[in-house]
């Protein structure tokens, strides 16, 4: 028992629980609603294993039940399950409403953070533009070129070839298992790539939400970073 490895993060604890109780916990995809009072069941079943403490179990449960994929699973008609996957009653309406509220608040926080990041980028770009303008103003004027003598042949300026616009390079998503709920990526649509956020990973593909608010299931070959 003394040589048991120690789980250092809540994500590692969740992965351990998903392996130990696969009918109850899941490491990816939509999660099933948990039985009320399942914390005490966990303490009795895994207490002492992997050097897990009650504090670690409580923190892992909090992270698991606040994730987007868990909140998506708390919906009308869903059944709570115990550690062995046995049904433990249908969800109450107040629990469904609370989960829906938590999900909307989480989405709003992501949108706020994204808007703040975009604002910082715009401010940095504007500041860089002002610095460039100041450098141009400080440059000394060029000396005037002497006029050419009359009759001298004037050289025709060479046409400047227009530079082709640089294509934005994207990295294709080769393995959906590396994606996480809430992660930002892009959805390919022809020659364009639209910003999107991962809502859940399903067996049919990845459900994403576009910046327009529309959600859809997209196959991995149409996703890029």
UniProtKB/Swiss-Prot annotation:
InterPro entries: ProQ, ProQ/FinO, ProQ/FinO_sf, ProQ_C. It holds the Pfam family ProQ. One of its GO terms (cellular component) is cytosol. Residues 103-173 are annotated as: Disordered. It is found in: Cytoplasm. GO terms for molecular function: RNA strand annealing activity; RNA strand-exchange activity. Residues 137-146 have a biased composition (Basic residues). Residues 147-156 have a biased composition (Basic and acidic residues). SMART domains: ProQ (SM00945). Keywords: Chaperone, Cytoplasm, RNA-binding. GO terms for biological process: post-transcriptional regulation of gene expression. Residues 109-118 have a biased composition (Low complexity). RNA chaperone with significant RNA binding, RNA strand exchange and RNA duplexing activities. May regulate ProP activity through an RNA-based, post-transcriptional mechanism. Belongs to the ProQ family. This is RNA chaperone ProQ. It comes from Klebsiella pneumoniae (strain 342). The gene is proQ.
């Amino acid at each position: 028992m003394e040589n048991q490895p120690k789980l250092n993060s809540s994500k590692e604890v969740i992965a351990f629980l998903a392996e130990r109780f696969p009918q109850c916990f899941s490491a990816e995809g939509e999660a099933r609603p948990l039985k009320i009072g399942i914390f005490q069941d966990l303490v009795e079943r895994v207490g002492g294993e992997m050097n897990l403490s009650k504090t670690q179990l409580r923190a892992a449960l909090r992270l698991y039940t606040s994730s987007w994929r868990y909140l998506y699973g708390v919906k009308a008609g869903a059944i709570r399950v115990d550690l062995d996957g046995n049904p433990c009653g249908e969800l109450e309406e107040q629990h469904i409403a609370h989960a829906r509220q938590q999900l909307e608040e989480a989405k709003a926080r992501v949108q706020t953070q994204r808007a703040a990041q975009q604002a910082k980028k715009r401010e940095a770009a504007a500041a860089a533009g002002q610095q460039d303008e100041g450098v141009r103003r400080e440059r000394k004027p060029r000396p005037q070129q002497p006029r050419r003598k009359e009759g001298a042949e004037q050289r025709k300026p060479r046409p400047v070839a227009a530079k082709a616009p640089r294509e934005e390079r994207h990295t294709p998503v080769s393995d959906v298992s590396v994606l996480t709920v809430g992660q930002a990526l892009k959805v390919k649509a022809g020659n364009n790539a639209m910003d999107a956020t991962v809502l859940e990973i399903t067996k049919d593909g990845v459900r994403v939400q576009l910046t327009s608010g529309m959600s859809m299931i997209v196959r991995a070959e149409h996703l890029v970073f």
